[in-house]
């Protein structure tokens, strides 16, 4: 069996800073057909808003054309957008949920 002579072990330190994930706004957009109570239900069901918060956001959507539901990392934001849009279609509403990079 051969013996290895002096073997140097080189350890390299790699310093990497973890970057926070890019954040995305999840937004509900106004339309002329989705009932206000359905929008409130969506906000409570998918964004854990209490009734007053949901009503306030629903009124912002109605009056300003869109309303902020929350800010999340991309994966969570994308999932919420998908879930809300699917729920709206299942209930025959044209409500549109989108995401915007912060």
Curated annotation (Swiss-Prot):
Pfam families: ClpS. SUPFAM superfamilies: ClpS-like. It comes from the Bacteria. GO terms for biological process: protein catabolic process; proteolysis. Coiled coil: none annotated. Binds to the N-terminal domain of the chaperone ClpA. Belongs to the ClpS family. Involved in the modulation of the specificity of the ClpAP-mediated ATP-dependent protein degradation. PANTHER family: ATP-DEPENDENT CLP PROTEASE ADAPTER PROTEIN CLPS (PTHR33473:SF19), ATP-DEPENDENT CLP PROTEASE ADAPTER PROTEIN CLPS1, CHLOROPLASTIC (PTHR33473). This is ATP-dependent Clp protease adapter protein ClpS.
